[in-house]
């Protein structure tokens, strides 16, 4: 015997890809974490225009807005560890306050378009749930992109 034990605790609960703003999606929704990674790989930080011509439920454009604002992922969700008694609620509040203090205010040129009016309606609703409805412009766009 080696007298070893491994103790693992789930501090998070639901995965971080569940940001909480996408109650409704469309066919082939993109996970929020993957959308955020795509935006970060594009090196978008809010200074240049951002365009998603096939926006679907708006996940990529919404993540672009959250990144431009420097919004902490998961700020609007709860974590399993918050129910543990040995971490005071004030510690969670302080962490949230610190994250909010690091957010940027600004005007960003973020646009999402889709041929499907229902998808655009869902994208607008998701942007509102994410708190970025004033930062992202969604339009039904039937123009050919070819």
List PLM regions with ranges:
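Conserved small/polar residues in nucleotide/adenosyl-binding loops
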Residues: 145
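Glycine-rich, flexible loop/turn motifs
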Residues: 12, 17, 26, 71, ...
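Conserved S-adenosyl-L-methionine
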Residues: 30, 34-141
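Non-catalytic substrate-recognition/targeting regions of SAM-dependent transferases
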Residues: 1-22
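Class I SAM-dependent methyltransferase Rossmann-like catalytic core
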Residues: 20-30
